[in-house]
Amino acid sequence: VNDEGFYTLLIGAADMGTGCDTTLAQIAAEVLECPLDNITTLSADTDWSPYDSGSYASSTTYVTGKATEKCALELRGKICALGCDKEQVSFDGREVRVEEGENAGKTISLSDIATASMNGNSIELQATVTHSSEISPPPYMVGAAEIEVDTETGEVTLLDYAAAVDCGT
């Protein structure tokens, strides 16, 4: 979170036309309850981006998407912790609101929290999370071949072949 309350999402996935930059930012925006425009996505530069095993069809959404969700949840927790120490609080994407106790109803904006995090507090408003899964949806492909078989020799001749591939999101 920068001092204006905007987010930077740093991912290792490469957007090869599948839209993962947008999809992963949408996941983060959903968890952080902020407009998509409040998130800048920086992706796939081996000099500074985190490791990602690769962009393989919908597995980017499932695997890197889960890491994005977990990371945004961790960041929400840090925002709430810095926004109000030892009180029951809620966060609606714009401000932290105290729900109970003598400070009930008081709020502090996300930009004020982000600025405070840069000034002598021990809570840094950033999170790094990894996620892996034994289950990841593969891309789907179907192929159909038209062949001719010589019944005397057993020789097979390929006459035509058609394929369709679903590369996922």
PLM regions: where:
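Cofactor-binding beta-sheet edge motifs in enzyme active sites
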Residues: V1-T169
